[in-house]
Amino acid sequence: MESQNNIDITANELYEKLESWNKDIKKSIDESKKHKKYSLKPKDLLIKFNRMPTPIKDLELIDIKLGSKIYEDEIFLEKDFIAENLRRGESLFYNKSEDSYDYARLGLPKFFDYQKSFLEIGTENKLKERVLGKIIEVSKNEKNVKYFVYLTTKVNGENFQVSYNSKYDCWVIASKNVSIAIRNKEDIEFYKNEKNFEEYYQGDSRIETMSEKEKKIKEKKDKKMEKKKKKLERIERRKKGKNEENDNQNENEEDEKDDNNENNENKINEEEKNDKMDIKKSKGLKEMLKRFTFSLEFAEIWLKILQEKIINNSNSDLINEFKKELGDHTLIGESVGDKKREHILVYKERDVIFYGIVNNKKLLSENCLPLSNGFDLFKKYNLSYTEISPSQKFDSLEDLCIYINEQFDVIFDKSLQESGEGNVIYLSCEIDGKEYVKGLGKLKTFEYRFLRKVREKCKTVPPPVDRSKIEFEIKKKFNELKKKKEKKKKDKDNEKAEDEEKEMIEKINKKIENETKEKNQERDKRINNIINKMKSESKTLLNEVPKSKFNNDKDLLKEYYDFGEYLINYRAKDLTNYFDVFASFIEVMKEKFKAKVEINDLLINEIRKKFEGLISDNDFKEEGDEDAKE
């Protein structure tokens, strides 16, 4: 692999640049309240730095990511600064003794869906700029350029990144957002010991609920007020001269005793507070260490891969050669075969499937290394890698886009079993015999896009109508009315009062029935609207590919729509049990789509544990990114 030592921006410069961005954003938070696009607020644009210790003396590892997860796609699409300076995985080393930063690892840029409309004249937007912008720039400024594209199969696993740093002789192993630095297997234990992280604990864990806390504060306040009241009473009695000298002495002793008790109580409270703080800190540290869950698993996998695929298959000299060649670069792949975290596609063995290599020192000027270079390295060191299909070379960018549009149609019609989510495209060009990757994008299958669409719609299904809540509210109103009438008509005879009571009960029941019926009708209407929206949005997808088999086979398309409708209605029946929806989702998918999807018991148990018994609308929020899962 070619070594490129010139840096386009130093780690120190990058850190200062990102900090400066945060300062400007914080100013805009104070100054502006009008930022309403995508419900986005200035605080969503803040960059988050997670600074953690490492087993190496005086060395910290800083994971850098966008603070907002909800609006990540919109921010990366709209904000040039974020798109240029943040990757899907980015970490720096900080050497405390040298007061300097170094690159630790670098992921691929954030990339988006390719659209056929990019080829249309006059189509200019941020999405096109993100996917094709750099290669369009090449076509305008360079001559004698050859254009081509690599299609790689999208691996269905967990994002895995590994880099080797020669300065500190360590591996940086990471999920998308959380990294660790280790030199050997023993260093893994460092990340399991709470004591190593005590000074980094920010106190973000809570032990008491607010109600418990408020209750204790009130009790303490009442006790103090009672003491103060007694003391004031004694002082008042003295002023009026009603106490004899003996009583005064007793009261003075009582005052002194109260003061001593208060001091002792304060001391005990302080000790209790410290004990609680220790418990809270311990709990908080345990929570904090959970963020390393994926990275520690990945470290075990990586050390095993090194042992089995490189050291055992050759000799110890090869590992040194591998480190030398990998230095200042990050391998990008997906961890697969974990039965506890299977996705739609099932992999027989635990492994890491690689698909890209990024130069850590080329944040601004390179997306990643040419795929031909990367795949040569994977082959040389016996690492698993994804399938790759290079296109022919074209003389113009327009010809390249025509070819990609043809591939768009082919991939669109493929099944989940054939292509899973779809393909990632690496837009490449050759200038003076040298290859560059100038853009990345995604081509997705209709099946995958449809399933995502159904999932999105399931999230918007309103909860079932709560009849008991309606009953409670209506009865409450009638009882209030009843009390008012009783005050005015105390002199009425009992028989008339009983008749009025019966009449009121009838009114209550009728109102409950009517309101429940109205709300159920309103909910049914909303569910039908969701189903219709699912169909209309799917038609919009199909309009992109007029010759698609789904457009030409109406019965096939009806099966898909029936399936989507079935899932949305299933979700509507029982909002609390997402597991059943998910299981049905897979079973119907197997039957309708003829997809050979394996479901193992471990997977089912994991899903059941995760989703069973949930009762709120949060069930259908995006999974993800607590740091441990990223």
Protein language model annotation of sequence segments:
Residues E2-K218, R234-G241, N269-E630:
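Core nucleotide-handling region used for phosphoryl-transfer chemistry
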